[in-house]
Swiss-Prot record:
It comes from Ligilactobacillus salivarius (strain UCC118) (Lactobacillus salivarius). This is Small ribosomal subunit protein uS8. The gene is rpsH. The keyword Ribosomal protein applies. It holds the Pfam family Ribosomal_S8. NCBIfam families: PRK00136.1. One of the primary rRNA binding proteins, it binds directly to 16S rRNA central domain where it helps coordinate assembly of the platform of the 30S subunit.
Length: 132
């Protein structure tokens, strides 16, 4: 079966593993998934990201992060721009998630970046997801 939205699948796997309090998860690799995983690592939402080359597509292993008392670091993930309804924003309309407590991930002409970086560079793009 052909997967119509691999980014939504990636985000759903993270959400499900987080809710089940798994230590890590594996997903088939792609450039955009790799970029999203790196952003999650840099912003402190996941502990580590590992790339496994299997002479095919490759695999991304994401190690989830939990706080004291085993509380979840990721409270929520929402896919915004979907294949059936794309969501684009101009540079002056880049959204803030929960007044800056979360992040928006955007696909821009400069690559996949966070909402903070997009505002600093004054560029808009496609809003991929909100994470808080």
């Amino acid at each position: 079966m052909v997967m119509t939205d691999p980014i939504a699948d990636f985000l759903t796997r993270i959400r499900n593993a987080n809710m089940a309090k798994h230590e890590s998860l594996e997903v088939p690799a792609s450039k955009i998934k790799r970029d999203i995983a790196e952003i999650l690592k840099n912003e402190g939402f996941v502990r580590d990201v590992e790339y496994i080359d299997d002479d095919k597509q490759g695999i991304i292993r994401v190690f989830l992060k939990y706080g004291k008392g085993n509380e979840r670091v990721i409270s929520g993930i929402r896919r915004i721009s979907k294949p059936g309804l794309r969501s684009y924003v101009k540079a002056d309309a880049v959204p803030k998630v929960l007044n800056g407590l979360g992040i928006a991930i955007l696909s821009t002409s400069e690559g996949v970046i966070t909402d903070k970086e997009a505002r600093a560079k004054k560029i808009g793009g496609e809003v991929i997801a909100y994470i808080w």
